[in-house]
Amino acid sequence: MAKEIKKIAVLTSGGDAPGMNAAIRGVVRAALNEGLEIFGVQDGYYGLYHDKVIPLDRRSVSEIINRGGTFLGSARFPQFKDIEVRKQAVKILAKYEIDALVVIGGDGSYMGAKLLTEEFGYPCIGLPGTIDNDIVGTDYTIGYQTALQTAVEAIDRLRDTSTSHQRISIVEIMGRHCGDLTISAALAGGCEYIIVPEKGLDKESLIHSIADNFRKGKRHAIIAITELMTDVHQLARELEEKFGHETRATVLGHIQRGGSPCPFDRILASRMGVYAVDLLRQGFGGRCVGIQNEHLVHHDIIDAINNMRRPFKQDIFEAASKLA
């Protein structure tokens, strides 16, 4: 029989994402409504290792649902890969008699929760908090929709100036090795060309396509590309030399992570926060939460990381390509 849960801690780890505060708020208030004690860990796994644990109450999470970032703070802490570091983290949790941990973050954060579950049998629930939308077991991650809105707004503005100056604009969008954000932003922003990790970069094909469109009377172009695929400034120089059109690269960068979360992310994060507490109350641990076909679901976090694969959004890519 699972141990009764009386105290829960929550942390945010890795890159911040709009909606993390809403998720923290959901966990905190749901826990308090169940009569549980709730703690916050500042600065992610780094803070857990360094005993940065604070008690939380309802007022701790007042007026944060609309705020971007994470009021608990976040940090990347690669040292957590060391089992001795994880042992110390478990000792800190035991010091406060914390029975379970809710981790909000991306795949690196999930890996930390997986190891705590796998090695120590410690009850962890993972909530997908990343703008990259690259987490298995969920259609959407917390922060993705807000980042998409930010990217589309940037593309809209670039289209105005690109059209006016007959310019080629290259827009680098976050996502690491996942093209979801780029594909959706390209479709919503009407980009002429889409380059994502799942399909690769074929410069010759890109040049041929741009040349063909210019011959047909096209006077400008917007290229959406996922980060880390190439040096976009070098690509801009190559295209300008090839076509004689002014070509500029814009790296959206961390602006995509900031800003007030959109309603979708606030709702998703709040629902997931409540759901995480419900799962712990039901005796579940070692799970990761997702939303699939509009329904909240949970998966074994070890199985999810080891065996599940994130499907490529082929239908959206094809639609964006056909409409380019």
From Swiss-Prot:
Superkingdom, natural source: Bacteria
InterPro entries hit by this protein: ATP_PFK, ATP_PFK_prok-type, PFKA_ATP_prok, Phosphofructokinase_CS, Phosphofructokinase_dom, PKF_sf
Main localisation: cytoplasm
Documented EC number(s): 2.7.1.11
Binding site for ATP: 15, 76-77, 106-109
Gene Ontology BP annotations: canonical glycolysis; fructose 1,6-bisphosphate metabolic process; fructose 6-phosphate metabolic process
Binding site for ADP: 25-29, 159, 190-192, 216, 218-220
GO CC term, one of those recorded: 6-phosphofructokinase complex
Pfam families: PFK
Keywords carried by this UniProt record: Allosteric enzyme, ATP-binding, Cytoplasm, Glycolysis, Kinase, Magnesium, Metal-binding, Nucleotide-binding, Transferase
Subunit structure comment from the entry: Homotetramer.
Physiological role: Catalyzes the phosphorylation of D-fructose 6-phosphate to fructose 1,6-bisphosphate by ATP, the first committing step of glycolysis.
Protein name according to UniProt: ATP-dependent 6-phosphofructokinase
